[in-house]
Amino acid sequence: MSRRTHSNSVSRIEFSCFVHATEEESKVTNAVLNLFPEELREDVTKNIYKMVTHGYHGNPIVILRVLLSSEKDSENTFSHIVSSLSEDDFQSLVSTIPERFDHGKLYIRVDKQKAYGGNVSLSESDDVIRIVVSLKPHLRSPQSIENFLISLRKAPTRAA
């Protein structure tokens, strides 16, 4: 199932996370892919940017990044994420909009381990996938963003 929205409120969405030396890169990649609607995953797989850096003790760290610049794909992906949150996480997201929103961007962190298992769960730990949602200019107040999130949660589904 996929979500379809027509509100044109998301201009782009970016995902990033670290793959530490103790983790399998393929598993972390799958965790990131699980945040996308199924019909986008194949294309997203081809557009994962990887950068290798080193930690304080010289251990390799891979940084994975995905940027969706298609407004339609970005909004459908964000709708998928919002709809996949538990009711408690959704309420937490809504209640923390002022802390998460800055200069047109909504910042969300989801649990990397749970994403690997196919669940979307907010997290404030360090082991997260960071999501930056660039919102269109008509979404600048907490109330307008809350209304948008509620509309995504209620968006009708369609067969893929």
Residue locations for each model-derived region?
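Long, charge-patterned amphipathic alpha-helical coiled-coil/hairpin "stalk" segments used as oligomerization
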Residues: 78-125
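Short, conserved charged micro-motifs
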Residues: 24-27, 72-79, 117, 140-146
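Short, charge-patterned binding micro-sites
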Residues: 42-72
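A common structural junction motif
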Residues: 35-40, 85-89, 128-129, 152-159
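Glycine-rich, aromatic-bearing surface loops/beta-hairpins
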Residues: 106-160
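Long, hydrophobic N-terminal alpha-helical segment
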Residues: 1-45
